[in-house]
């Protein structure tokens, strides 16, 4: 997910996106713990997407 795409979304959409990403991160962690996760790069990708969304939310809160 690109930072520019995130910045174009509304605050409500960003909060919904953050919730979905946190759920996805939880599911990936559970898959890793049980040995079912074959694409481990997804953990890093989701973690960074969460950080991007949180950053943009903080930027919008400052405006």
Curated annotation (Swiss-Prot):
Family recorded in the similarity comment: Belongs to the universal ribosomal protein uL29 family.
Transmembrane residue ranges: none
Record GO terms (molecular function): structural constituent of ribosome
Record's GO cellular component terms: cytosolic large ribosomal subunit
Protein name as annotated: Large ribosomal subunit protein uL29
Organism: Chromohalobacter salexigens (strain ATCC BAA-138 / DSM 3043 / CIP 106854 / NCIMB 13768 / 1H11)
A GO BP entry: translation
UniProt KW keywords: Ribonucleoprotein, Ribosomal protein
Gene3D superfamilies xref list: 1.10.287.310
This protein's encoding gene: rpmC
PROSITE patterns membership: RIBOSOMAL_L29 (PS00579)
InterPro entries linked to this entry: Ribosomal_protein_uL29, Ribosomal_uL29, Ribosomal_uL29_CS, Ribosomal_uL29_sf
Cited HAMAP family: Ribosomal_uL29
